[in-house]
């Protein structure tokens, strides 16, 4: 899967979960600062990422994901 395909899937997921316009989602979007995501929102988002991409994201790694771009890079580097 290409970086663009990963980004598009993540952006669609965020748009649906947080009810924001898909066009406003960029790689620089910060989960906590821009989305006001609390810890439950973030855990649910990580679970969605795991389900969508078939990857297991350990808690230590998940805590380091601050932006959409970081999530894209993580998924890209951990693809099967």
Swiss-Prot record:
It comes from the Bacteria. One of its GO terms (molecular function) is acyl binding. It is found in: Cytoplasm. The modification O-(pantetheine 4'-phosphoryl)serine is found at residue 39. PROSITE patterns: CARRIER. One of its GO terms (biological process) is lipid A biosynthetic process. Residues 1-79 form the Carrier domain. Pathway: Lipid metabolism; fatty acid biosynthesis. Keywords: Cytoplasm, Fatty acid biosynthesis, Fatty acid metabolism, Lipid biosynthesis, Lipid metabolism, Phosphopantetheine, Phosphoprotein. Pfam families: PP-binding (PF00550). GO terms for cellular component: cytosol; membrane. InterPro entries: ACP, ACP-like_sf, PP-bd_ACP. 4'-phosphopantetheine is transferred from CoA to a specific serine of apo-ACP by AcpS. This modification is essential for activity because fatty acids are bound in thioester linkage to the sulfhydryl of the prosthetic group. Carrier of the growing fatty acid chain in fatty acid biosynthesis. NCBIfam families: acyl_carrier, PRK00982.1-2, PRK00982.1-4, PRK12449.1. Belongs to the acyl carrier protein (ACP) family. This is Acyl carrier protein. It comes from Lactobacillus johnsonii (strain CNCM I-12250 / La1 / NCC 533). The lineage of its organism: Bacteria, Bacillati, Bacillota, Bacilli, Lactobacillales.
